[in-house]
Structure formats: structure tokens, C-alpha cells
Amino acid sequence: MADKAAEAEQRAAQVIEGVLKDAELEWESPASGTYVVKLPGTRKLSTTVSLIVGRHTLSLNAFVIRHPDENESGVHRWLLERNLKLFGVSYAVDPLGDIYVSGRLPLPAVTPEGVDQLLGQVLEAADGSFNTLLELGFASAIRKEYEWRVSRGESTRNLDAFTHLLQRPSSRNDPE
């Protein structure tokens, strides 16, 4: 039995390393069966994923955003609704309220296609949802940051995705 488990771990590690090399991703293996992978993003600069090959499962975790400053229940509701649409991974919250993507896969299911699909799901969940999560949990901070940058003549280019948050709704008494 122990030999079969060791063989499954070794095979899973080989599959993971092959996928990471083929995808030309930046990664390191600080310990046998442990991988730290940097996934490039479009909204979030990058997402770091930890992959750990255990005796029976491959587990993965990736940090998404810190504990929301505001609208925590709205953020959590959005995460739970979004979990219904994800495959192989789900959002999780740690004891500090920070948000992660986590997943677990049985070692016999670790295939090149499966690992690629999991990494794609992590990227979609962490990077694809990044701006939405910022809007939901940090709208006030975004507004303050924008005002601070404008007052100092600094670039607001990386806040362009949030311009709709910066426009104040007009009052009914305002002339059009």
C-alpha cells in the first residue's frame, strides 16, 4: 500500500512539473512535492499558487485579497454565489478574513489536462474577479486613493477600471 501511495505522489509530481514547464510559468519547488507557482494576471499583477502533493490528494491555495474594509457580508455573498460556477476550486476565508482560492484533487485524477484546468480556474477566480472584489469591499478606499492622487497631480491610470465608482450620482434637484 505504501509503495502505491509513493508511486502516486511521484507520478503527480512529475505531471505537475511537466505542466509548469510546458506552460513556461515561473515556479519553484522549495520541498519535494511542494510547488509555488506565479500566474501572470491582467487585473491583478500576478497570483501566487501553492500546490502540495500529499499522500492521497493534491491541494492548492492562492491568496486573492485581504479582509474587505467594508461590505463584508456583500463580499461573502458574492463569493458563495461565485463558488457555484467554479470547477475544482472554491473561495475560502481564513481566520483573519483574508480571501483565498483553494482546491483539492485526488492523486489519481492529477493529469496534465486536470492541472491545467485547475490553474486556469485559479487564475479566473483570483485575477478575473479581482476588480469586482475590490469594488465590493474597498470602494471607499478607492475613492480616497483617487482623490489623494488627483490632489497631488499623480497618475490615476491604474484606477481607470473604477471610474464608475468615482462619479457621484446626481441629485434629483440638480439641473440637467
Per-region residue spans from a language model:
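Short, charged/polar, Gly/Pro-enriched secondary-structure boundary elements
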Residues: 43-47, 107-110
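A short acidic-to-branched-hydrophobic micro-motif
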Residues: 47-66
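A generic structural motif
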Residues: 64-68, 105-114
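A contiguous, mid-protein "functional segment" used to position or interact
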Residues: 108-149
